[in-house]
Amino acid sequence: MSIQTPEQLIDRLANDLAWRKKELSAMKSLIEAKNVSDKRHKVLLRSGVCILYSHWEGFVKLAANSYLEYVISQKLTYQKLSSNFLALAMKEKLKKAKETHKASLYIPVCEFFISELNQRSILPKPKDVISTGSNLNSEILKEITYILGIDFSIYSTKSPLINTQLLKTRNEIAHGEDSVFDRDEYLELHRDIIGMLDIFRNQIENAAIQKKFRRDSP
């Protein structure tokens, strides 16, 4: 079912984040358990980092795609879209013109800006826009926030955590390296990632409620 109201968007985000938090909570409980061998505890920590990353990437992608789906469902004209979404709509037109190096292909682009802004907008499908490449680092997150028109500065101080503690460690584990990660490091990482997921969810919900996708939003 397509998302056509802020309430539907909020419900989708709430339901998705709920099961992710439940699974992460279960993993955290296993890692905090005292009655496990050091060998098993190491396995749990390595598994925990991988699961933590999967939910970080999974929720950001779902939330971003869901918001874009909601914006598309509003069927706004180009002139009513905020700058970030207008840029997204124009991306393919400009890309085709640039790739051919033919000046003639810029003529339709110019005509669009002159006479077609009052037409109903056509935005690309969410799956063609939001891509993490299975490596959701801080730069990719920044690009996603720019596409959606939400604030990245909240995450800027978390870049080392995202890029090194989470992504680099997860990649090392996934590639079979014997990375060392202790309980306290994991628990701190768990808290920080849960916090960022909540922030991202709130940003998406607020953007929808406040109609930040519209040029005339307050």
Identify the function of each model-found stretch.
Residues 1-47, 78-84:
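Charged alpha-helical initiation segments
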Residues 2-25, 139-218:
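Polyanionic, low-complexity intrinsically disordered segments
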Residues 28-36, 64, 68, 178:
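Short, flexible helix-adjacent loops and helix caps
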Residues 32, 70-74, 192:
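Residue-level signature of transmembrane alpha-helix interfaces in integral membrane proteins
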Residues 33, 61, 68, 183-186, ...:
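A generic "cationic amphipathic patch" detector
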Residues 40-52, 56, 181, 185:
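Conserved aromatic-histidine-acidic binding/catalytic patches
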Residues 51-52, 59, 64-155:
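Helix-loop junctions and short alpha-helical segments
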Residues 53-61, 65, 191, 195-198, ...:
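A broad, structural surface signal
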